[in-house]
Amino acid sequence: MWIIYKEFSFEAAHQLPHHEGKCRRLHGHSFRGRVYVASDRLKTTGSETGMVMDFSVLKAHLDPLVKNHLDHYYLNDSLGLESPTSEAIAAWIFAKLEEAGVPGLHSVEVLETCTSAARYFSPRLSPLL
């Protein structure tokens, strides 16, 4: 089994209306993330020979999501989520990439700080722990 990932980053603001701490207030993060794609075999023909997927293909799916919904947005509005936690953002990105037909989509990880992250896994796959 092979797993590749593509990293991304975005600056955004959000607030968690149900949170009892400081995250209830409007605040921002320098978010980072990774999209993981898995395959039990490598491509054997064409320009992707020897690859799970060309990273540029994954980037082509990911970049519009970042540009049009995440980077420098107020996530409560742009994602249509009442409480855009890192968990919810990871699931939202996963759903959009799945809708776009990204083959082998395994998981999406979103880091809101360098020490705090959430990772959403495909229900079809077992998490790698």
From Swiss-Prot:
Protein name: 6-carboxy-5,6,7,8-tetrahydropterin synthase
Annotated residues for binding of Zn(2+): 14, 27, 29
Cofactor note: Binds 1 zinc ion per subunit.
E.C. no: 4.1.2.50
Organism for this UniProt entry: Synechocystis sp. (strain ATCC 27184 / PCC 6803 / Kazusa)
An example molecular function term from Gene Ontology annotations: metal ion binding
Keyword Oxidoreductase included in the entry's annotation: no
UniProt lineage: Bacteria, Bacillati, Cyanobacteriota, Cyanophyceae, Synechococcales
Reaction(s) the record says it catalyses: 7,8-dihydroneopterin 3'-triphosphate + H2O = 6-carboxy-5,6,7,8-tetrahydropterin + triphosphate + acetaldehyde + 2 H(+)
Keyword annotations: Lyase, Metal-binding, Queuosine biosynthesis, Zinc
Family, per entry: Belongs to the PTPS family. QueD subfamily.
Gene from which this protein is expressed: queD
Cofactor(s) the protein needs: Zn(2+)
Pathway the protein takes part in: Purine metabolism; 7-cyano-7-deazaguanine biosynthesis
